[in-house]
């Protein structure tokens, strides 16, 4: 007799056969009633890798034992500590090692990148973003426009969703780039839209923007560690991201930045700081700034070593699993959840995120029948029974099954609780 592919027993079989199942044990889970919480919020804050504590302690021990000499001696010299995460980051984002650097935080890095790559002229001064962009991105873009004496009402172009569910077609994006092309100085686009969970064809967006003569940058906050990326091959000028979501580097973690290799030795204007000075002569303390080649030339201050340690722990797990295997499991998990919702609770939940796996990562954005009031009621009920998603105004519950630590049986637990709530 064939097993029902949407049964609990089939989910258990999928979990037992999962080649990545051991990775779950590498993370610390919050507890609820003496059990591991069912955690679907890796898109907001990833779980703590168990090895993070040891790596942070290693830095603390080195600080205690060596004090300032820890910059130049010890098991992991702080002078080059940021380079310990460089190769792993490059593999995750599809870049050359010298194109990436871990530094600052996302919005700080976005300002640094716009200082270099947003070069408005009389004819070409507009910035194109998606309508409903993450507020910090929009604040950064508006403030950059004002710094140049430009009015956001005139020079900020927002591409409105062309679907009732709030998503954007590639046709709409292409049409906007074509329509405004001669005015565009910069196209700034997300890898994944934070509210809808929609993933975009980044290579195509980069090609279209550059064909119009615009610089192109990506905010990869919800894409890095979630979907395969190929930043070098896509030809994007720059990208920025955070590490506290899918890369599990902890609250307020150090951010990440990509600068394409074609800019590695350029004389682009930049906001400079001493740690961006070339390493061989940095400690001569000379007044002339000589940038390090590649993305490291945009560094400002010495790296936050304690904050880099958890990222190092997480990247070891990504290297152990590999992005292709993580993506394959992610598509299975999210597809399984989609089937469960359509089959068992279609009258309760509407999926906002596109059904095409190429247009989403692991996150499904959900609206609850009955609107915001019912949505909040379900969200709070799920919290009360130890199932944690997150809420985004005005009416979206986001559920993100993360392949590093979520299981197929977690999806059944979620849907069973939705059924219980709906039947009450």
Curated annotation (Swiss-Prot):
Residues that, per the record, bind pyridoxal 5'-phosphate: 106-107, 134-137, 219, 222, 244, 274, 302
GO MF entries: kynureninase activity; pyridoxal phosphate binding
Enzyme Commission designation: 3.7.1.3
Reaction catalysis annotation: L-kynurenine + H2O = anthranilate + L-alanine + H(+); 3-hydroxy-L-kynurenine + H2O = 3-hydroxyanthranilate + L-alanine + H(+)
One Pfam family cited in the UniProt record for this chain: KYNU_C
One GO CC annotation: cytoplasm
Record pathway: Amino-acid degradation; L-kynurenine degradation; L-alanine and anthranilate from L-kynurenine: step 1/1; Cofactor biosynthesis; NAD(+) biosynthesis; quinolinate from L-kynurenine: step 2/3
N6-(pyridoxal phosphate)lysine modifications at: 245
Keyword set includes Hydrolase: yes
This protein's record includes keyword Hydrolase: yes
InterPro entries (alphabetical): Kynureninase, PyrdxlP-dep_Trfase, PyrdxlP-dep_Trfase_major, PyrdxlP-dep_Trfase_small
Record key words, sorted: Hydrolase, Pyridine nucleotide biosynthesis, Pyridoxal phosphate
Biological processes per GO annotation: anthranilate metabolic process; L-kynurenine catabolic process; L-tryptophan catabolic process to kynurenine; NAD biosynthetic process; quinolinate biosynthetic process
Cofactors required: pyridoxal 5'-phosphate
Assembly with partners or alone: Homodimer.
Its job: Catalyzes the cleavage of L-kynurenine (L-Kyn) and L-3-hydroxykynurenine (L-3OHKyn) into anthranilic acid (AA) and 3-hydroxyanthranilic acid (3-OHAA), respectively.
Family: Belongs to the kynureninase family.
Name this protein carries in UniProt: Kynureninase
Source organism: Xanthomonas campestris pv. campestris (strain B100)
Lineage: Bacteria, Pseudomonadati, Pseudomonadota, Gammaproteobacteria, Lysobacterales
Gene that encodes the chain: kynU
């Amino acid at each position: 007799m064939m097993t029902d592919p949407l049964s609990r027993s089939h989910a258990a079989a999928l979990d037992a056969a999962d080649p990545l199942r051991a990775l779950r044990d590498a993370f610390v889970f919050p507890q609820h009633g003496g059990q591991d919480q069912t955690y679907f919020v890796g898109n907001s804050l990833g779980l703590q890798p168990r090895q993070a504590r040891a790596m942070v302690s290693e830095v603390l021990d080195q600080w205690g034992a060596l004090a300032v000499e820890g910059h130049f001696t010890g098991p992991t010299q702080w002078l080059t500590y940021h380079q310990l995460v460089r190769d792993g980051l490059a593999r995750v984002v599809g870049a050359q090692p010298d194109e990436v650097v871990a530094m600052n935080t996302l919005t700080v890095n976005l300002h640094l990148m716009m200082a270099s790559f947003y070069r408005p002229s009389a004819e070409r001064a507009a910035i194109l973003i998606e309508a409903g962009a993450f507020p910090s991105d929009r604040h950064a873009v508006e403030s950059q426009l004002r710094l140049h004496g430009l009015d956001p009402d005139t020079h900020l172009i927002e591409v409105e969703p062309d679907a009732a569910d709030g998503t954007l077609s590639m046709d709409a994006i292409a049409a906007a780039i074509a329509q405004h092309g001669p005015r565009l100085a910069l196209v700034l686009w997300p890898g994944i839209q934070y509210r809808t969970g929609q993933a975009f064809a980044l290579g195509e967006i980069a090609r279209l923007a550059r064909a119009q003569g615009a610089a192109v940058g990506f905010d990869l906050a919800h894409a890095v560690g979630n979907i395969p990326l190929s930043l070098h091959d896509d030809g994007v000028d720059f990208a920025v991201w955070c590490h506290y979501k899918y890369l599990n580097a902890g609250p307020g973690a150090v951010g990440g930045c990509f600068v394409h290799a074609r800019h590695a030795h350029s004389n682009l204007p930049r906001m400079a700081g001493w740690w961006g000075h070339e390493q061989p002569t940095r400690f001569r303390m000379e007044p002339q700034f000589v940038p390090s080649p590649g993305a490291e030339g945009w560094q400002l201050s010495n790296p936050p070593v304690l904050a880099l340690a958890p990222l190092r722990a997480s990247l070891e797990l990504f290297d152990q699993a590999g992005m292709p295997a993580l993506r394959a499991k992610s598509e299975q998990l999210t597809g399984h959840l989609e089937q469960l919702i359509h089959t068992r609770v279609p009258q309760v939940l509407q999926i906002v995120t596109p059904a095409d796996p190429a247009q989403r990562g692991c996150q499904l954005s959900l609206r609850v029948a009955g609107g915001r009031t019912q949505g909040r009621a379900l969200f709070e009920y799920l919290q009360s029974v130890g199932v944690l998603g997150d809420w985004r105004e005005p009416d979206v519950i986001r559920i993100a099954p993360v392949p590093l630590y979520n299981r197929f049986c977690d999806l059944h637990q979620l849907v069973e609780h939705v059924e219980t709530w709906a039947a009450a």
